[in-house]
Regions:
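Accessory terminal regions of nucleic-acid processing enzymes
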Residues: 1-261
Length: 261
C-alpha cells in the first residue's frame, strides 16, 4: 500500500493541504462512478457490440482533471448543508461501527493505486490489513432505504472496489449512519468482498480515461504550441499501458475497442 499523506482533514474538519495536493490531477475513487458512466446503449448498439456514448458526468470529470493537471489547482466543489451534516457526524459513525463490529478503524490519507500513480483513493478508514469502511451519513429517507434494501448500494460499489484495489484489501464495509433515528436503526453495515473481474474492469476504464485526458493535452499542444505541465503534476501522470495489470485482452476491449493487444 502506497500512502503518500497521513491525514485528510484537520481537527476542525477543513481539508489538509497535503491531502488536497496529493489528490490534485489524480483520478480518485470517489469519482470512479463518473469514470464508469455511459449513456444507456440502444438495442442496435448492443447487437453491434458498439461501446455506448459517454455520459455528461464522465465528460465533465475529464475536463475537471484536465484543468487540475494544467494548473495544479484543486477543483472547487459546492458543499451543501446535508454534506456538512455528514462530515460532522462521520467520526460518530466510525465509533459506532467500531463498537458494533468490535474492531478498530485506522484513518489514513491518500493511497496511490498499486499499478499507476495517476489514481488513488482516500478511504474513510482501514480495518486491520484486509478491510476498509465506506461511511455515509445520509438523510433519514435514504438511510431507511438502505436498512430496508439490505444490500450495498450499486452506486457506491465502483468506489469501494477501486479502494480495495488501491489498498490491496479483501473486503470493504458500507456503513450508513443516522443519529436522528432510534438506537437500533442508527447504523447499517453491509460487506462487499473483492471481485477480481469487477476490479480489473474498473482498472481498464481508469486507464482509458487517463489516456483520454492525455489526448486532450496533446491536442492542445499541437494546436497552440508546446508547454510543460506544472512540476508537481508531471510526476503524477506518466503514461501507462495495460501491461502488468493482469487484465486480459478481452476485458480491455470491453472498455477500449481500439485496443490491439
Amino acid at each position: 500500500m502506497k500512502i503518500i499523506c497521513a491525514h485528510q482533514k484537520h481537527e476542525d474538519g477543513t481539508p489538509h493541504a497535503d491531502w488536497l495536493q496529493a489528490r490534485t490531477g489524480r483520478i480518485t475513487a470517489s469519482r470512479i462512478g463518473d469514470v464508469m458512466s455511459y449513456l444507456k446503449p440502444t438495442k442496435a448498439m448492443i447487437e453491434a457490440r458498439v461501446k455506448p456514448e459517454e455520459s455528461q458526468k464522465r465528460k465533465d470529470y475529464r475536463m475537471e482533471i484536465l484543468c487540475e493537471r494544467l494548473t495544479a489547482v484543486p477543483a472547487e466543489h459546492f458543499v451543501s448543508k446535508p454534506m456538512k451534516f455528514g462530515s460532522e457526524y462521520e467520526d460518530d459513525a466510525r465509533r459506532e461501527y467500531e463498537l458494533k463490529m468490535e474492531t478498530m478503524v485506522d484513518q489514513t490519507g491518500f493511497v496511490l493505486h498499486t499499478a499507476f500513480d495517476y489514481a488513488g483513493c482516500s478511504p474513510d478508514g482501514l480495518v486491520g490489513t484486509e478491510g476498509a469502511v465506506q461511511i455515509k451519513v445520509p438523510n433519514t429517507e435514504t438511510h431507511l432505504g438502505y436498512l430496508l434494501g439490505d444490500v450495498v448500494p450499486e452506486e457506491y460499489k465502483p468506489q469501494m472496489y477501486f479502494e480495495m484495489d488501491c489498498c490491496e484489501l479483501a473486503w470493504s464495509d458500507f456503513v450508513s449512519y443516522d443519529p436522528r433515528l432510534p438506537d437500533p436503526l442508527k447504523l447499517f453495515v453491509k460487506r462487499l468482498h473483492y471481485d477480481d473481474e469487477r476490479v480489473q474492469l474498473i482498472a481498464g476504464e481508469v486507464l482509458c480515461f487517463n489516456d483520454s485526458v492525455n489526448a486532450w493535452i496533446d491536442m492542445l499542444r499541437k494546436r497552440f504550441g508546446d508547454f510543460k505541465l506544472p512540476a508537481q503534476i508531471a510526476a503524477k501522470v506518466q503514461s501507462q499501458d495495460y501491461d502488468g495489470l493482469g487484465i486480459s485482452d478481452e476485458e480491455i476491449r470491453a472498455v477500449d475497442p481500439a485496443w490491439q493487444g
